[in-house]
């Protein structure tokens, strides 16, 4: 591409309440994950979205709340997780998480139909949940694309994937941001400019 994609301003407009912040931790130990969740919630009144074992024996923890609350909870979580101990696989703190993310974070949802669209699609597969959420958030804040599907860890060996649709130039801009944010955590990124009719709107049968 000729230039870096323009990044949308994710900061809420003046006078409007903050969008919820999001904190995510992936741990290699289920027992450590539970103690991390306990410490995080005792430190600040964040709302616990998820604290559960997932595929490959990992523990996944998600919290939301005001920015200051999530910051404090994440500080406590890191202290108990033990930086450098090997228990903390990945972490993510998003002060202003994009609004399209939230409905995909608690449990798998049925993706919206897009059979009638002529949109292009990218499929992103990552090694960690944090990488998927972080890169999807960045892509959504960079280009006018739509998050169609997101699956996190359960039933897919602890990996994560998501799909984005939009005009070809927009999904290509989103893909550039995804690659940058994921780095070595990106397992695969595929772009289909014009999905075949049998797959359009339902990539997974």
Curated annotation (Swiss-Prot):
PROSITE patterns linked to this entry: BMC_2
Domain notes: These proteins have 2 BMC domains which evolve independently of each other, giving the term pseudohexamer to the trimerized subunit. Although the homotrimer fills the approximate space of a BMC hexamer protein, the BMC-T trimers are more compact. Their universal presence in BMCs indicates their structural importance. The homohexamers form pores of at least 5 Angstroms in diameter.
Residues covered by the BMC domain: 21-106, 120-204
Mutant lacking the gene: phenotype: Required for efficient BMC formation; when deleted from an artificial operon (Hoch_5815, Hoch_5812, Hoch_3341, Hoch_5816, Hoch_4425, Hoch_4426, Hoch_5814) being expressed in E.coli, a >10-fold decrease in BMC shells is seen.
Protein name according to UniProt: Bacterial microcompartment protein trimer-1
Site description Gating residue, residues in chain: 52
Assembly information from the UniProt record: Homotrimerizes to form a pseudohexamer. Unlike its paralogs BMC-T2 and BMC-T3, the pseudohexamers do not stack. The concave side faces outward, with the N- and C-terminii exposed to the cytoplasm.
Subcellular localization, as worded in the UniProt entry: Bacterial microcompartment
Entry keyword set: Bacterial microcompartment
Family indicated by similarity: Belongs to the bacterial microcompartments protein family.
Function: A minor component of the bacterial microcompartment (BMC) shell. Expression of 5 proteins in E.coli (BMC-H (Hoch_5815), BMC-P (Hoch_5814), and 3 BMC-T (Hoch_5812, Hoch_5816, Hoch_3341)) forms 40 nm artificial BMCs with a molecular mass of 6.5 MDa. This protein does not form stacked pseudohexamers in the BMC. There are 20 BMC-T pseudohexamers per BMC, composed of mixed BMC-T1, BMC-T2 and BMC-T3. The shell facets are 20-30 Angstroms thick, with 1 of BMC-T trimers protruding to the exterior.
Biotechnological relevance of this protein: Artificial BMCs can be made in E.coli by expressing (Hoch_5815, Hoch_5812, Hoch_3341, Hoch_5816, Hoch_4425, Hoch_4426, Hoch_5814) or (BMC-H (Hoch_5815), BMC-P (Hoch_5814), and 3 BMC-T (Hoch_5812, Hoch_5816, Hoch_3341)). Cargo proteins can be targeted to this BMC. BMC-H can be modified to place its N- and C-terminii in the interior of the shell (called CPH). Fusing proteins to the C-terminus of CPH allows targeting of cargo proteins to the lumen of the organelle composed of CPH, BMC-P and BMC-T1.
InterPro entries for this protein: BMC_dom, BMC_shell, CcmK-like_sf, CcmK/CsoS1_BMC, Micro_shell_prot_PduT
Classification via Pfam families: BMC
Residue ranges the record marks as coiled coil: none
Region of interest (Disordered), residue spans: 1-20
Species, as recorded: Haliangium ochraceum (strain DSM 14365 / JCM 11303 / SMP-2)
Example of a GO cellular component annotation carried by this entry: bacterial microcompartment
